């Protein structure tokens, strides 16, 4: 996966679910992870890719995700030898305790992509960020990888 606007070039690890039914986060700051129960990037409805904002005191793969702007490209190489090219249309911040799962991950009538990381202030007691950053993107083309 490449996101030129924020200098991301990362392979994708497969991610499943945790015991509580939420998506398992990537095991470290790199690489980003694709939720394998969601569609392959470029198929109908949104594919979901998550990455850490930081890890062990160092920037993670999605450290600059909040800096994406509408029009920025995300390129995801697929196992079929094609690359899905997406265009970011918005980036939003949501409180984790009010994360709109249906609005972010729910069905849409086109091929989309959601990039998700942590954001907001850091809760020292919980050792977690209070918010999530979600970038919304739509497929614009496929090309040879």
What do these predicted regions represent?
Residues 1-69, 77-82, 90-145:
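Solvent-exposed, non-transmembrane regions of membrane-associated and secreted proteins
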């Amino acid at each position: 996966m490449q996101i030129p606007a924020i200098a991301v070039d990362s392979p994708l690890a497969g991610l499943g679910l945790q015991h509580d039914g939420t998506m398992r986060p990537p095991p470290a700051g790199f690489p980003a992870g694709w939720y394998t129960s969601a569609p392959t990037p470029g198929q109908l409805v949104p594919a979901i890719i998550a990455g850490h904002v930081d890890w062990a005191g160092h920037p993670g793969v999605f450290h600059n995700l909040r800096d994406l702007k509408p029009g920025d490209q995300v390129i995801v190489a697929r196992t079929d030898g094609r690359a899905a090219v997406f265009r970011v249309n918005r980036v939003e911040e949501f409180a984790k305790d009010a994360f709109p799962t249906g609005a972010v991950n729910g069905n849409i009538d086109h091929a989309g992509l959601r990039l998700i990381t942590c954001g907001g202030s850091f809760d020292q007691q919980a050792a977690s960020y209070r918010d999530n950053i979600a970038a919304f993107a739509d497929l614009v083309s496929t090309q040879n990888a």
